[in-house]
Amino acid sequence: MLPFLSMLVLLVQPLGNLGAEMKSLSQRSVPNTCTLVMCSPTENGLPGRDGRDGREGPRGEKGDPGLPGPMGLSGLQGPTGPVGPKGENGSAGEPGPKGERGLSGPPGLPGIPGPAGKEGPSGKQGNIGPQGKPGPKGEAGPKGEVGAPGMQGSTGAKGSTGPKGERGAPGVQGAPGNAGAAGPAGPAGPQGAPGSRGPPGLKGDRGVPGDRGIKGESGLPDSAALRQQMEALKGKLQRLEVAFSHYQKAALFPDGRSVGDKIFRTADSEKPFEDAQEMCKQAGGQLASPRSATENAAIQQLITAHNKAAFLSMTDVGTEGKFTYPTGEPLVYSNWAPGEPNNNGGAENCVEIFTNGQWNDKACGEQRLVICEF
């Protein structure tokens, strides 16, 4: 390396300096001159022998850094470092495919009851249920209003004479009694004014001859007036016989209530409307036809005692929605339940009365308690 650098130094020097040096060196008397003096380049001589290595020169300045060398081979993988802190959550990924249905879990605890719903509309009153078992005797309630007068009871045993009481209020007129035996003829009274001629009655059966009466005083010779009086008496007797016959037939029904001149009775039998109507007609009456709240209350007492609904006589067979009595008269009193009559199912043409006294339109083919009116 050193000889190469020496040649570079010599080549860099100017030729003039080189020649002067050579001249000065050539004038000196130095042994073995050939080894020290270089030939002039103009002389084209042979190259000299290699010189000795000179002393090492001073260390030069640090040169500029060279270009980076090629990347070396990867080193061996180092040991795994400690786990770093948890990073922030990444963005949600796309939903994966739906998995298979899992097994049913155990039933959950019952939820809290929701708020109470609105009150629904009133349902239609159902049929009367079977009579329940009698409950324990309750406490005595307040004294009720005076009820409708009951039927005349049978004559009781004669009691001992009590002290004279105060005069009571007039009682309800009782049913006409049986016709008594004919009494003796009384004295003839003064002749009254002639009355209007009544309609001739039906000829009655010939009666049993009575006892001969006491001879009366001589009356006025107006035979026409006497005949009129006799005809009037016959008419009254016939009406009494008809009324008595009705009471006899009504007595066949064991349970009843009396209101004014009406009697409502039942035999505790249940029939369809037409059969019930025929049953009352054969007994000389008709199905119950309440025309007032008092009569309706008397019928209610009967059906409450039997715990059954009963048919009334009114229908709307002639005109839908217009109920009439059997005579064709429109109603003068009614006590319909709320929302009635509604002709449910399009075939409710008869009327039934519930144990609460309210009315409902009902199919005539149903069976209901028979209550007759006399």
From Swiss-Prot:
Alphabetically ordered keywords of this record = Calcium, Coiled coil, Collagen, Disulfide bond, Extracellular matrix, Gaseous exchange, Glycoprotein, Hydroxylation, Immunity, Innate immunity, Lectin, Repeat, S-nitrosylation, Secreted, Signal, Surface film
Q: Which PROSITE patterns match?
A: C_TYPE_LECTIN_1 (PS00615), C_TYPE_LECTIN_2 (PS50041)
Q: Which GO terms describe its molecular function?
A: carbohydrate binding; identical protein binding
Residues making up the signal peptide according to the UniProt record: 1-19
Q: Name one GO biological process term.
A: lung alveolus development
* Principal cellular location given in the protein's record: secreted
Q: Which residues form a coiled coil?
A: 222-253
* Glycosites: N89
| Pfam families to which the protein is assigned, alphabetical | Collagen, Lectin_C, Surfac_D-trimer
Q: Where is this region: Disordered?
A: 38-222
| Record's comment on post-translational modification | S-nitrosylation at Cys-34 and Cys-39 alters the quaternary structure which results in a pro-inflammatory chemoattractive signaling activity with macrophages.
Question: Ranges for the Collagen-like domain?
Answer: 45-221
At what positions is S-nitrosocysteine found? C34, C39
Q: What's a single GO CC term here?
A: collagen trimer
Q: Where in the cell is it found?
A: Secreted, Extracellular space, Extracellular matrix; Secreted, Extracellular space, Surface film
Compositionally biased spans, kind Basic and acidic residues: 49-64, 203-215
Role this protein plays: Contributes to the lung's defense against inhaled microorganisms, organic antigens and toxins. Interacts with compounds such as bacterial lipopolysaccharides, oligosaccharides and fatty acids and modulates leukocyte action in immune response. May participate in the extracellular reorganization or turnover of pulmonary surfactant. Binds strongly maltose residues and to a lesser extent other alpha-glucosyl moieties.
General remark: Pulmonary surfactant consists of 90% lipid and 10% protein. There are 4 surfactant-associated proteins: 2 collagenous, carbohydrate-binding glycoproteins (SP-A and SP-D) and 2 small hydrophobic proteins (SP-B and SP-C).
Could you tell me what this protein is called?
Answer: Pulmonary surfactant-associated protein D
Which organism is the protein's source? Answer: Mus musculus (Mouse)
Q: What gene, per UniProt, encodes this protein?
A: Sftpd
